[in-house]
């Protein structure tokens, strides 16, 4: 979507302008179409303007998206208007779009505000003496589960600043990094690079649709071509005052709760021949993924300074079971088949290989997302582990009955990098 504005014309055209304005008013009355006119000369041009947001946020709801939208957005238009532009062709570029950039800025603002009630854990950047959690029963005894949660002791400054007190708490393995070779001394991750914040599991976190609207004198151009690839000319164009509702879901690898394509699966990239560019796949059918963290934790408050309390895990009740996500193998394989069909239209006579990430930050290597205020990091090796030959046959490295469910192991991250002071 792009914003278009009307441009002022200061030339002395008032005589012809008055006549033209009268003609436009007659046409408008006949067809119920309106256009902003300055001195009788309607001129459209591409414009960069500040959009504003609209939402149906509930002021009484303490969920962080509702709290942010209540203060930052206006109520939605109960009767939105869309005008189809006949015989109009416009060029669009989804990869260089001012609307998207403003959305990103708003998401950053939303997350900053959402993390403000959370405790800054930077004062906890001390040496942690950690051991594997003992006296715990593991559900299946896998090595992935063992060592996932560690029991750590550390010294913290109490409310009285010159007093030191020894405390202990349970930390996820993703939240700590070793500082010696014997794997007993640790520190919180990202302590030496930026401000870190404790995630807030108690905070309600459920994205709501956000609409972006153009101010008076501007309109948003919308491309309605169902197979539009993201760049180039679009022949089915309309104008709207606001976009559709967009849920600001933040995730990596898999896009959650996105919009579905009407018709076939659509793949988009800024440049398919450049392997450094991202390829976005828009599915035509949703694939359900159910995620859970089955552990039952008890928490305790640890004073880490005046007015600051860190809520840490004290113990785990019952079995230690790994967080995981479930997805239907049949639906996933059918989705991959449709994606491969579209990829082969771009890469002819090529073998398509779905493989896991070769390395990098946890957010890149794993499927990361926020669920109920907790940050999940899930291994997608089982999802991206197949080879599709150029003659339309495929070879799954782990063939099995398609009626089964793929169980994706996940890890929880409690300490997050807030990135700014």
From Swiss-Prot:
Q: What ranges does the record give for the region V4, renumbered to this chain?
A: 378-410
Subcellular location per UniProt equals: Virion membrane
Q: Which Gene3D superfamilies match?
A: Human immunodeficiency virus 1, Gp160, envelope glycoprotein
Q: Which cysteines are joined by disulfide bonds?
A: 53-73, 118-200, 125-191, 130-152, 213-242, 223-234, 291-325, 378-410
Any one biological process term the GO annotation gives:
clathrin-dependent endocytosis of virus by host cell
Annotated signal sequence is 1-31
Region of interest (CD4-binding loop), residue spans:
357-367
* InterPro entries for this protein: Gp120_core_sf, HIV1_Gp120
Region V2, annotated ranges: 152-191
Can the keyword Glycoprotein be found in this entry's annotation? yes
- Coarse class of the primary localization is virion
One cellular component term (GO) for this entry is:
viral envelope
What more does the entry say?
HIV-1 lineages are divided in three main groups, M (for Major), O (for Outlier), and N (for New, or Non-M, Non-O). The vast majority of strains found worldwide belong to the group M. Group O seems to be endemic to and largely confined to Cameroon and neighboring countries in West Central Africa, where these viruses represent a small minority of HIV-1 strains. The group N is represented by a limited number of isolates from Cameroonian persons. The group M is further subdivided in 9 clades or subtypes (A to D, F to H, J and K).
Which named protein is this? Truncated surface protein
């Amino acid at each position: 979507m792009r914003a278009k504005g009307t441009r002022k014309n200061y030339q002395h055209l008032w005589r012809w302008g008055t006549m033209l304005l009268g003609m436009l008013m007659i046409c408008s009355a006949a067809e119920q179409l309106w256009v902003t006119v300055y001195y009788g000369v309607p001129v459209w041009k591409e414009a960069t303007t500040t959009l504003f947001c609209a939402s149906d946020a509930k002021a009484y709801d303490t969920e962080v998206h509702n709290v942010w939208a209540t203060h930052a957005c206006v109520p939605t238009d109960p009767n939105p208007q869309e005008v189809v532009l006949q015989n109009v062709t416009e060029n669009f570029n989804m990869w260089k779009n001012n609307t998207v950039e403003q959305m990103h800025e708003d998401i950053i603002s939303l997350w900053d505000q959402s993390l403000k009630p959370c405790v800054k854990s930077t004062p906890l950047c001390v040496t942690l003496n950690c051991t594997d959690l003992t006296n715990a029963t593991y559900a299946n005894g896998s090595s992935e589960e063992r060592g996932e949660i560690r029991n750590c002791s550390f010294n913290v400054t109490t409310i009285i600043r010159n007093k030191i007190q020894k405390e202990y708490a349970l930390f996820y393995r993703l939240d700590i990094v070793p500082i010696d070779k014997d794997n007993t001394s640790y520190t919180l991750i990202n302590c030496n690079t930026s401000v870190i914040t404790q995630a807030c599991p108690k905070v309600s976190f459920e994205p709501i649709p956000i609409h972006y609207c153009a101010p008076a004198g501007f309109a948003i151009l919308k491309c309605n071509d169902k197979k539009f690839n993201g760049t180039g000319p679009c022949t089915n164009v309309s104008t709207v005052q606001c976009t559709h509702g967009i849920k600001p879901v933040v995730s990596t690898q898999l896009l959650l709760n996105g919009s579905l394509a009407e018709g076939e699966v659509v793949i988009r990239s800024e440049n398919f021949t450049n392997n450094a560019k991202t390829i976005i796949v828009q599915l035509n059918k949703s694939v359900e993924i159910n995620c859970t963290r089955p552990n039952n934790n008890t928490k305790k408050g640890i004073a880490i300074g005046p007015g600051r309390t860190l809520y840490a895990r004290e113990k785990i009740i019952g079995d230690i079971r790994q967080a995981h996500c479930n997805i239907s193998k049949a639906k996933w394989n059918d989705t991959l088949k449709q994606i491969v069909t579209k990829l082969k239209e771009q890469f002819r006579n090529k073998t398509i290989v779905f493989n896991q990430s070769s390395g990098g930050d946890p957010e890149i290597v794993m499927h990361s997302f926020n669920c109920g205020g907790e940050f999940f990091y899930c291994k997608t090796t089982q999802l991206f582990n197949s080879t599709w030959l150029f003659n339309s046959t495929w070879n799954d490295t782990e063939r099995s009955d398609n009626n089964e469910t793929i169980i994706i192991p996940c890890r929880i991250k409690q300490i997050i990098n807030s990135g700014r002071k």
